[in-house]
C-alpha cells in the first residue's frame, strides 16, 4: 500500500514539474486560503515570472501584446488617457507657478499697491510658495500615490490644482479694493495649487512602470516631464504678449482677471480627464518588472533605502542642481539682461523651455532604444556647465549690436537643451537604481530634494548679489556662484556616477529559478493590487 502511494506521489510530482510556473498553483495550496476568482484569473493572465520569460518586456509591443515564451504581458490604450491627465496637470500647474515672474512690477502694484523697495516682491513670494509647499507635501504625495493608486493621486492633484486656480482668479477681481485681501487670496490660491505638485511630480515614473512596456517607459516619463517646461513657456510668452501695453489704472483693471480666468479653464481640463480614469492599474501588467513589483518594503524603510544608497544620493544631487540651477537662473536673469541693455521680457525663458522640450523627446527616444541613462546625464551636465559659463562671459559686456540678443537666445536654448532632459532621464535612472522601491517613492525623493534646492538657490543668488564682491555690478558674482555649482555637477557625473540598473537586470536575466519554487507577484497579491 505504501509502495502504491509513493508511486502516485511520484507521478503527481512529474506532472507538476511539466506545468509552467505561470499557470502552476503552489504546492502548499492546502495550507493557504483558497485563491479568489480574481487572484486565479490574474495568475493565469501571466502575472508570474518564470525561468524562461523573465525578460519578456525586452520584446517590442505588437497589437498591444508583449510576449515571450509562455508569459503574456499586455498594454492598453487607456494608458494614454492616464498619461494625458498627468501631462495637462503639469502644464497647468507650471503656468500658474511661472506666470507672474515676467510681470514683477505689474503684479507688485496690482496686488500690493506699492513698490517692493527692497522687500520681497509679490511675484517672488508666489514663486517661492510653490517650492516650499512641494518640499513639505511631497512625502504625502509619495505615500498616497504608492498606497492608494494612480487614480486617487490624479483626482487629488487635479482637484487641488483647479481649486487653487479658482482662488487666484477670485483674487484678481477688480471689485476687491483691499490690496491686503488681494495678496492674501493670491498666496492662498498659490499654496493650494502648489500642493498638486506632490502628485504630478511623482506620477510619471509610476504611470510609466504600471501602464507602459519596457520600450516605452522613458518616453512616457519624458512626455510627463516636458509638460512642465511647456507650461513654463506658456506662462512666460502669454503674459509678455497680453501685458505688453499694460498700464496700472482703470483702463486695464480687468487684465489680470482675464489672464487668471484663462489659467482657470486650463486647470479645469485635466480635472475633467481625471474623471474618466476608471482603474488604478491595468488588469494585466505590461512588463516583467511591473508584474514582479511588490509593495512590501514599507514607506519609511523605502525612503531610508533610497537615502542610504550612495549612487542614488549622487543622483539626487545631480537632479537638484539640474532642476534648481536652470529655473532659478532664468528667473534671476531678467535683472542682468536689463542691466546690460537687453529688453527681452520673458522670451529667454520661453526659448529655454521650448528647446528643452524638444531635446527631452529626443533623449527619451535614445534612452528607450539604448538604455544609456548615465551617459545622457553626463553629456547634459557637461553641456549645461559650458552653456552657463559661456553666458556668464558673454554678459560681461553690454549689448553692442543687433546680433547680441540672438546669441543670448541661443545660449538660453542650450541651457534648456542640456538641463531639462535630466529631469525625466534622472527619474528613470533613480527608479533603476533603487528597484524594487516603489516608483513614486524614489522619484518623490528626487523631486523633493530638487524643490528644496530650488527654494534655497534664489536666496543664495540674492545674498551673493548683495555682497558686492569683486565687481561693480553685483549680479556678476551671483552668476559666478551658479557656474561653480554647475562645475560640481560635472565632477559628480563624470567621476562618481556609476549606477547599477537593478530593474533592467531583472528584466534581462535568465535567472535560475527553481522549477518548484512558487512565485507570487504584485498582481497576484490582493493587498498589493489594492495598494497600486
Where are the language model's segments positioned?
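C-terminal transmembrane helical hairpin of 12-TM major facilitator-type secondary transporters
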Residues: 374-425
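Cytoplasmic helix-loop-helix junction between adjacent transmembrane helices
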Residues: 191-226
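Glycine-rich segments within core transmembrane alpha-helices of 12-TM secondary carriers
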Residues: 218-244, 447-457
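Helix-to-loop junctions at the C-terminal end of transmembrane segments
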Residues: 137-150, 359-372
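Extracytoplasmic gate region of multi-pass secondary transporters
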Residues: 100-101, 309-356, 457
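Cytosolic juxtamembrane N-terminal segment immediately preceding the first transmembrane helix
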Residues: 2-8, 19, 26-95
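Symmetry-related core transmembrane helices of the 12-TM Major Facilitator Superfamily/SLC fold
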Residues: 257-276, 477-495
Amino acid at each position: 500500500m505504501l509502495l502504491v502511494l509513493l508511486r502516485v506521489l511520484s507521478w503527481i510530482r512529474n506532472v507538476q514539474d511539466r506545468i509552467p510556473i505561470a499557470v502552476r498553483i503552489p504546492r502548499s495550496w492546502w495550507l493557504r486560503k483558497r485563491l479568489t476568482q480574481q487572484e486565479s484569473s490574474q495568475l493565469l493572465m501571466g502575472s508570474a515570472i518564470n525561468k524562461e520569460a523573465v525578460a519578456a518586456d525586452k520584446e517590442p509591443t505588437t497589437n498591444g501584446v508583449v510576449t515571450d515564451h509562455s508569459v503574456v504581458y499586455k498594454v492598453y490604450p487607456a494608458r494614454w488617457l492616464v498619461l494625458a491627465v498627468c501631462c495637462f496637470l503639469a502644464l497647468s500647474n507650471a503656468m500658474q507657478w511661472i506666470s507672474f515672474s515676467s510681470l514683477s512690477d505689474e503684479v507688485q502694484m496690482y496686488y500690493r499697491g506699492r513698490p517692493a523697495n527692497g522687500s520681497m516682491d509679490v511675484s517672488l513670494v508666489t514663486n517661492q510658495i510653490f517650492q516650499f509647499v512641494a518640499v513639505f507635501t511631497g512625502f504625502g504625495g509619495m505615500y498616497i500615490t504608492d498606497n492608494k493608486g494612480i487614480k486617487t493621486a490624479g483626482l487629488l492633484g487635479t482637484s487641488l490644482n483647479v481649486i487653487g486656480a479658482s482662488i487666484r482668479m477670485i483674487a484678481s477681481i477688480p471689485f476687491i479694493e483691499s490690496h491686503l485681501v488681494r495678496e492674501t487670496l493670491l498666496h492662498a490660491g498659490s499654496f493650494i495649487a502648489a500642493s498638486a505638485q506632490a502628485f504630478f511630480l511623482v506620477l510619471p515614473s509610476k504611470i510609466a512602470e504600471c501602464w507602459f512596456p519596457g520600450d516605452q517607459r522613458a518616453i512616457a516619463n519624458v512626455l510627463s516631464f516636458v509638460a512642465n517646461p511647456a507650461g513654463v513657456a506658456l506662462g512666460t510668452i502669454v503674459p509678455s504678449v497680453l501685458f505688453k501695453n499694460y498700464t496700472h489704472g482703470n483702463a486695464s483693471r480687468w487684465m489680470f482677471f482675464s489672464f487668471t480666468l484663462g489659467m482657470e479653464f486650463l486647470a479645469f481640463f485635466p480635472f475633467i480627464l481625471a474623471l474618466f480614469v476608471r482603474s488604478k492599474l491595468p488588469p494585466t501588467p505590461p512588463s516583467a518588472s511591473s508584474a514582479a513589483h511588490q509593495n512590501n518594503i514599507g514607506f519609511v524603510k523605502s525612503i531610508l533605502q533610497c537615502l542610504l544608497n550612495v549612487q542614488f544620493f549622487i543622483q539626487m544631487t545631480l537632479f537638484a542642481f539640474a532642476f534648481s540651477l536652470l529655473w532659478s537662473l532664468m528667473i534671476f536673469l531678467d535683472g542682468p539682461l536689463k542691466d546690460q541693455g537687453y529688453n527681452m521680457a520673458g522670451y529667454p525663458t520661453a526659448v529655454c523651455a521650448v528647446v528643452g522640450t524638444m531635446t527631452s523627446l529626443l533623449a527619451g527616444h535614445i534612452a528607450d532604444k539604448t538604455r544609456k541613462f548615465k551617459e545622457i546625464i553626463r553629456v547634459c551636465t557637461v553641456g549645461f556647465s559650458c552653456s552657463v559659463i559661456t553666458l556668464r562671459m558673454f554678459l560681461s559686456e553690454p549689448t553692442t549690436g543687433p546680433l547680441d540678443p540672438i546669441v543670448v537666445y541661443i545660449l538660453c536654448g542650450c541651457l534648456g537643451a542640456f538641463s531639462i532632459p535630466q529631469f525625466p532621464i534622472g527619474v528613470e535612472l533613480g527608479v533603476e537604481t533603487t528597484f524594487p522601491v516603489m516608483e513614486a517613492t524614489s522619484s518623490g525623493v528626487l523631486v523633493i530634494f530638487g524643490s528644496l534646492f530650488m527654494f534655497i538657490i534664489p536666496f543664495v543668488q540674492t545674498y551673493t548679489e548683495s555682497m558686492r564682491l569683486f565687481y561693480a555690478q553685483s549680479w556678476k558674482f551671483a552668476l559666478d556662484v551658479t557656474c561653480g555649482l554647475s562645475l560640481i555637477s560635472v565632477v559628480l557625473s563624470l567621476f562618481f556616477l556609476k549606477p547599477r540598473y537593478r530593474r533592467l537586470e531583472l528584466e534581462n536575466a535568465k535567472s535560475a529559478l527553481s522549477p518548484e519554487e512558487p512565485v507570487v507577484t504584485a498582481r497576484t497579491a490582493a493587498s498589493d493590487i489594492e495598494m497600486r
